[in-house]
């Protein structure tokens, strides 16, 4: 069984083909980073127009990479939400149209379920149950996962997502968009302890996050100190350490609350090396396991949509003839498979 996956929720056009026996057969990705760099962030209208230009050529490239023809595709999965409405509509329209033309089922996929299941693409996939840390530019959530579609929200950010805080703080430090990875690279040259940032909402019970205050603290620290390269690196180090520590503390609480021994980390920020190292160290001390996808599957991609579509297809999920998307779509609303 082979599923074509289409991802267009934001500023990456991702197309992949997944085979339930052979695994990933094709993976094509186009990033719009250069398109949005001059604006310091994603411009929704530009993102949608670029998806229109890139989606079909990437599908053709994926078919060529896999050596398959359209007749050998058994279903088409597409990201139906959450995300930018215009961008979502491009992928949904193309996906639904191809499914109709090829006479195969169309499978709407939840973007964050795609991220959550991305570690399943690895050679050592996690088993249920586990705590999932979904951490990206748009989401920071802790989820109790006991099966496909069996998701319970434990905590989430009440304001900025961790990835958004990374990008905004990077901009304050004079780094280009997207600044998160650049900030981490700068932080590696920083001196630990020169600046000490707060660990938001760790001084009280609960599993919710807040990162807007941390961004403000960073802005004040930047204004109050010199603009030399080492000072900027030290501030980046203090900021990254604060975010990583906060995420780690909340993960520890979630594991204590659920009693689970496995932690899954997914989303763009899960590619952060410092975060990976800290969580791996924490889970080793707890005699548990931590799982995450390879870096290219942490950010938005078609492979996770193709895989999640395969899982949902086997569970009987299909879409009607209409084209509909959900820019806001709580993960907990998904049905169990």
Swiss-Prot record:
Sites where the protein binds Fe cation: 111, 115, 300
Cofactor dependence: Fe(2+)
Any one GO BP annotation for this protein: tRNA threonylcarbamoyladenosine modification
One of the Pfam families matching this protein, by short name: TsaD
UniProt KW keywords: Acyltransferase, Cytoplasm, Iron, Metal-binding, Transferase, tRNA processing
GO molecular function, one term: N(6)-L-threonylcarbamoyladenine synthase activity
Record keyword Iron present: yes
Family annotation (InterPro entries): ATPase_NBD (IPR043129), Gcp-like_dom (IPR000905), KAE1/TsaD (IPR017861), Peptidase_M22_CS (IPR017860), TsaD (IPR022450)
Binding site for substrate: 134-138, 167, 180, 272
SUPFAM superfamilies recorded: Actin-like ATPase domain
Cellular component GO terms, alphabetical: cytoplasm
Localisation per UniProt entry: Cytoplasm
Cofactor comment: Binds 1 Fe(2+) ion per subunit.
EC annotation from Swiss-Prot or TrEMBL: 2.3.1.234
Reaction equation(s) it catalyzes: L-threonylcarbamoyladenylate + adenosine(37) in tRNA = N(6)-L-threonylcarbamoyladenosine(37) in tRNA + AMP + H(+)
Class in the EC hierarchy, top level: transferase
Function: Required for the formation of a threonylcarbamoyl group on adenosine at position 37 (t(6)A37) in tRNAs that read codons beginning with adenine. Is involved in the transfer of the threonylcarbamoyl moiety of threonylcarbamoyl-AMP (TC-AMP) to the N6 group of A37, together with TsaE and TsaB. TsaD likely plays a direct catalytic role in this reaction.
Family affiliation: Belongs to the KAE1 / TsaD family.
Name assigned to this protein: tRNA N6-adenosine threonylcarbamoyltransferase
The species this protein was found in: Citrobacter koseri (strain ATCC BAA-895 / CDC 4225-83 / SGSC4696)
The organism's taxonomic lineage, starting at the top: Bacteria, Pseudomonadati, Pseudomonadota, Gammaproteobacteria, Enterobacterales
Gene this protein is translated from: tsaD
């Amino acid at each position: 069984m082979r599923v074509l996956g289409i991802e267009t929720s934001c500023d990456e056009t991702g197309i992949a083909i997944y085979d339930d026996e052979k695994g990933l057969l094709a993976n094509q990705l186009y990033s719009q980073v250069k398109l949005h760099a001059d604006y310091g962030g994603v411009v929704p209208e530009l993102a949608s127009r670029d998806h229109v230009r890139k989606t079909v050529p990437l599908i053709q490239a994926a078919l060529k990479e896999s050596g398959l023809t359209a007749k050998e595709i058994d279903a088409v999965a597409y990201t139906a939400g959450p995300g930018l409405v215009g961008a979502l509509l491009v992928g949904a329209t193309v996906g639904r149209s191809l499914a109709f033309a090829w006479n195969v089922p169309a499978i709407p996929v939840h973007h964050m379920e795609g991220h959550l299941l991305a570690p399943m693409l690895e050679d050592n996939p996690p088993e249920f149950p586990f705590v999932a840390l979904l951490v990206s530019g748009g989401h920071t959530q802790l989820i109790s996962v006991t099966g496909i579609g069996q998701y319970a929200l434990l905590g989430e950010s009440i304001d900025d997502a961790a990835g958004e805080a990374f990008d905004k703080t990077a901009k304050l430090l004079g780094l280009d968009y997207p600044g998160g990875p650049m900030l981490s690279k700068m932080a590696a040259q920083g001196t630990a302890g020169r600046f000490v940032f707060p660990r938001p909402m760790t001084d009280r019970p609960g599993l919710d996050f807040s990162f807007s205050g941390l961004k403000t603290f960073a802005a004040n620290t930047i204004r109050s100190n010199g603009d030399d390269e080492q000072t900027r690196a030290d501030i980046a180090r203090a900021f990254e350490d604060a975010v990583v520590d906060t995420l780690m503390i909340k993960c520890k609480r979630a594991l204590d609350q659920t009693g689970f021994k496995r932690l899954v980390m997914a989303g763009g920020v899960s590619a952060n090396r410092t975060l990976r190292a800290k969580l791996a160290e924490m889970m080793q001390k707890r005699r548990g396991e931590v799982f995450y996808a390879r870096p290219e599957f942490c950010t938005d991609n078609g492979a996770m949509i193709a895989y999640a579509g395969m899982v949902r297809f086997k569970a009987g999920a299909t879409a009607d003839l209409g084209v509909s998307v959900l820019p806001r779509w709580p993960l907990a609303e998904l049905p169990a498979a």
